[in-house]
Amino acid sequence: MDKNELVQKAKLAEQAERYDDMAACMKRVTEEGGELSNEERNLLSVAYKNVVGARRSSWRVVSSIEQKTEGAEKKQEMSREYREKIEAELREICNDVLNLLDKFLIANATQPESKVFYLKMKGDYYRYLAEVAAGNAKTEIVGQSQKAYQDAFDISKTEMQPTHPIRLGLALNFSVFYYEILNCPDKACALAKAAFDEAIAELDTLSEESYKDSTLIMQLLRDNLTLWTSDTQGDEAEQGEGGEN
């Protein structure tokens, strides 16, 4: 199957909501080498986001059940084994994506926009690994996530408008990283607020084609700020991810 056919099959799989098939197609497209078009890049991102998202959601449910079965040994053991099975799947998916990023995507990116997109993606998938990691392994993974986000952030500040949806999406996820993974609510709020304020100040630079994406992410930044600065704590903070492209 040539590249065009793989892309068409990925689009078909997306419509059928068969995201594992979609990811497999886009993985093959990526492994052919060369720089991905914006459309191909977005197809790859959507495919893996859905594939990993299903496991992250399952992991949260099973972890919660496991905690509630304390005292019921058999049930707890079954929950633990199932959680570990989901974790193994999640790790495999994340490592797949990180391998594609390091081997092909980041190296082949010629435009600042693409570089930021892929470095953000690298930060995201290390963050997903960090959610299920523990001990020394977690420290290492968290460091990798932070470095990728910071590298992307530095490029975005000099090369992209504050209203660019990729720059805004990066700020959104980097702030979620500070809140959820590093437990630094002050840093998370400062980052989200700065991104929101900088975008508001330059609303006139908002291009027509990215208007919808940018304003959606700005809304998510504001929602997270409201959530984080209130007394409500908890997993709802993760809603910030809804606005990724």
Curated annotation (Swiss-Prot):
Compartment(s) where it occurs, according to its Swiss-Prot or TrEMBL record: Cytoplasm
Record bears the keyword Cytoplasm: yes
Any GO BP annotation: signal transduction
Gene Ontology molecular function terms on file: phosphoserine residue binding; protein sequestering activity
GO cellular component annotations of the record: cytoplasm
Keyword Cytoplasm: yes
Lineage: superkingdom: Eukaryota
PANTHER family linked to this entry: 14-3-3 PROTEIN
Function text: Adapter protein implicated in the regulation of a large spectrum of both general and specialized signaling pathways. Binds to a large number of partners, usually by recognition of a phosphoserine or phosphothreonine motif. Binding generally results in the modulation of the activity of the binding partner.
Annotated protein name in UniProt: 14-3-3 protein zeta
